[in-house]
Amino acid sequence: ANVLWLQGGAXSGNTMSFLNAEEPSAXDLVTDFGINVLXQ
């Protein structure tokens, strides 16, 4: 699955919340579920 993450000018903290997740971690999501993250 592909995930496109668009970051605008707002500082809502969504990116940091995603990266700091404990269970499942961002690394676990990418490796275990085969997710392709495309960040902008």
Swiss-Prot record:
UniProt keyword annotations, A-Z: Iron, Oxidoreductase
The enzyme's E.C. designation: 1.12.2.1
Catalytic activity entry: 2 Fe(III)-[cytochrome c3] + H2 = 2 Fe(II)-[cytochrome c3] + 2 H(+)
Cofactors demanded by this protein: Fe cation
InterPro entries named among the record's database cross-references: NiFe_Hase_small_N_sf
Alphabetical list of SUPFAM superfamilies matching this protein: HydA/Nqo6-like
Keyword Iron: yes
MF term (GO), any: cytochrome-c3 hydrogenase activity
Annotated Gene3D superfamilies: NADH:ubiquinone oxidoreductase-like, 20kDa subunit
Name of the protein: Cytochrome c3 hydrogenase small chain
UniProt source species: Acidithiobacillus ferrooxidans (Thiobacillus ferrooxidans)
